[in-house]
């Protein structure tokens, strides 16, 4: 995986509905082609195993799709759920103890986000909120990923 492929995915990701998809495609992985809400076409890994979520509340949607263990694929996140919905977080943590061990990268829309750590984890998909596309552009995260 390299920064360029992660960038390609992030640019596409910043524009899908509630969850936006970005990915770094591994050459040998089976991929699918998707079109995001902005009309961008991107290839993503068909069954990603390493996902970073830009906001903790995205775990609610992931839980709908992966009811057995919504945290199984999450390798990093913005752990704001702990602050904004502590009751739900405690329930998730009780059911899925590994939630407590997931590293937080802070906000992907600010300087606190650690791009190097995201890449070092072998991240295949980054999910971001469409409402923060402008913030992602203004923070320079898309440009940083393009370098």
Q: Model-flagged regions — what are they?
A:
Residues 2-17:
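Bacterial N-terminal signal peptides that target proteins for export
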Residues 43-47, 68-69, 119-121, 146:
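Extracellular/periplasmic catalytic domains that process cell-envelope and extracellular macromolecules
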Residues 14-26:
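Hydrophobic core
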Residues 78, 135-147:
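Charged, glycine-enriched surface loops/patches
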Residues 59-120, 125-134:
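A short, structured surface patch at a secondary-structure boundary
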Residues 30, 99-101, 147:
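A short helix-to-beta-strand connector/capping loop
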Residues 2-3, 24-63:
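Bacterial Sec-exported substrate-binding components of ABC uptake systems
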